[in-house]
């Protein structure tokens, strides 16, 4: 009797493992999110601009949670919540802190020092976060899942800073 019970239990556990796997589109999204975060970090750490490097440290705090996946053939929609530092608030504060320097015709060195000082202090603070709910649209192209609306994900990563993401890049 115990052998039969073990086989039934083992079969049940095996079926649960197979049934509880993540959909392929979710796996592709998770892999792509990690790659995007790595690319952003890598690009922002190039060169010797300390303020940009500090900003990269702030951005790498972004996380995500996949709430729901609706996969239908070659299309998929993921309901994702991206939690990131609320950059809109902090960049507004930064611009206000620069106002006296701008009015006094600051030099580039003063701007650089003020920027580094601000982001250095910011990295020591307990930062506020914002959550952005994103409907991620994916399509299976040549056997691989691809995100269609990448800008929406970037807005979430940049803490709702839509102007930065959607601005024309030269």
PLM regions: where:
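Bacterial signal peptide processing site
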Residues: 21-23
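Mixed-charge, low-complexity intrinsically disordered segments
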Residues: 86-130, 168
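C-terminal motif of bacterial Sec signal peptides marking the signal peptidase cleavage site
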Residues: 16-19
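Bacterial N-terminal signal peptides that target proteins for export
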Residues: 1-8
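Beta-strand elements of well-folded, non-transmembrane domains
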Residues: 82-88, 140-142
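N-terminal, intrinsically disordered, polar/charged segments of Gram-positive cell-envelope systems
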Residues: 26-56, 109, 165-166
